[in-house]
Amino acid sequence: MKSRSYNQYCGLAYALDVVGERWTLLIVREMIAGPRRFKDLLDGLPGISTNLLAERLKNLEQQAVIRRRVLPPPAGSTVYELTVLGQALEKTLLELGKWGSQFVPQSMEGATVLRAGSYALTLKTFFRPERAQGINETYELHIDGEVLHVQIAAGEIQVQQGAAPKADAVFTTDTPSYLQLLAGQLQPDQAIAEERIQITGEPGALDRFLSICGIADVQAETAS
């Protein structure tokens, strides 16, 4: 399919020529947590067709936003990952995600299941570096079968798909409970008592994680 262009001599217009098509930014989002197989992307983007995903990936590859590579044995899978040019979109996506959070409804009813890319974007968007000073911990999250790990060090955050080589704490929960914890709608003690979250490791790590990455305070600041 021939790519369309706004044909405007403007940086924003040219940016939209590259990433403005439907699904494109969500495909980029899915790679924020690391390389993804075609099937991973298809599973993480309910509603996109196989042909359309292939077309969007081809366009992004042609624009050098992503690249394909084959993982070494024993995996041997072909994965898609962001190039340096693609990684430069992260800051823009974080700001766009923060702006878009004011339109997110309270209930997930009718919405599709979240995947690692969406979790990673949310964690990075609402990360509070001023609260992370002096904390050097790695948290492993298991959310309805999705596994990712969050590393906090030197006031910075890194989020990657998959289990951590060495985690200080492992949190296992479901999507509604996880989102309610982040939003401050569910308190950690209540979640533990009701067995809505299981913690392996230091129990206080959950409070630190929510203080650093929770969205309750940010939502209050936005509302004011």
Residue ranges and their predicted role:
Residues 59:
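Alpha-helical DNA-recognition elements
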Residues 65-66:
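Short hydrophobic beta-strand motif reused across regulatory alpha/beta modules
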Residues 56:
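Residues within the DNA-recognition helix of helix-turn-helix
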Residues 20, 72-95:
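Basic, amphipathic "hinge/linker" alpha-helix immediately C-terminal to the N-terminal HTH DNA-binding motif
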Residues 85-149, 203-224:
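Acidic, aliphatic-rich amphipathic alpha-helical segments
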Residues 10-49:
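N-terminal helix-turn-helix DNA-binding core of bacterial DNA-binding proteins
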Residues 164-224:
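C-terminal interaction segments
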